[in-house]
Amino acid sequence: MAEEYIIVNPSDDKSIDVIFRILRKCGYNLAKKGLFHWIPSYSRRAIKKDCETKTVVLVHDDEVKEYTSTFQMYVNKEGNLYVRKIATLPQFEGRGIGGRNLRFMEDFARQNGCKKICLDVYIRSKGAIGFYRHHGFVEIGEKRSIRFKELIMEKRLI
């Protein structure tokens, strides 16, 4: 499959709406599995604000001619790439999209001089934790957010 990685501009309301729908669908899908950390949905206003301060990516699959996933990235104060709001629509899970998105993130990190990619994952999201482990991420700690506990993971880039 060939993906197009679109960096979303804060004035691109159409793309922001697509991201909102992807995050909402993923949140509902997680809730069906007993994982409620993405309910309520992330707002359009919050996504727009993120587009001003982070690299917000919308992924279009050229083969199926649909938007399949989204994620956000920024270089944190330690000089590492921090990724968040990583979501692939449920109907596209298991097709390698997540792995290809991680490779895009790794390339972006290297281009920006980062030595690590960092992320936080809901501690009960066993599927996501296993996915990140499979792709070379290791747990380095835990933290408490406002509503739940998160596992801090990182991947060192060679």
Regions found by a protein language model. Give the residues of each.
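Acetyl-CoA-dependent GNAT
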Residues: Y5, P10-Q91, L102-F104, F108, ...
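Conserved catalytic-core motifs of GNAT/GCN5-like acyltransferases
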Residues: C118-Y122, I129, R133-I152
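Conserved GNAT acetyl-CoA-binding A-motif
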Residues: A109-D120
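Short glycine-rich hinge loops at helix-strand junctions in the catalytic core
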Residues: G96, G113, G136
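Residues forming the Rossmann-fold NAD(P)(H) cofactor-binding site
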Residues: G99
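Active-site acidic-Proline motif in GNAT/NAT acetyltransferases
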Residues: L89-Q91, R95, I123-R124
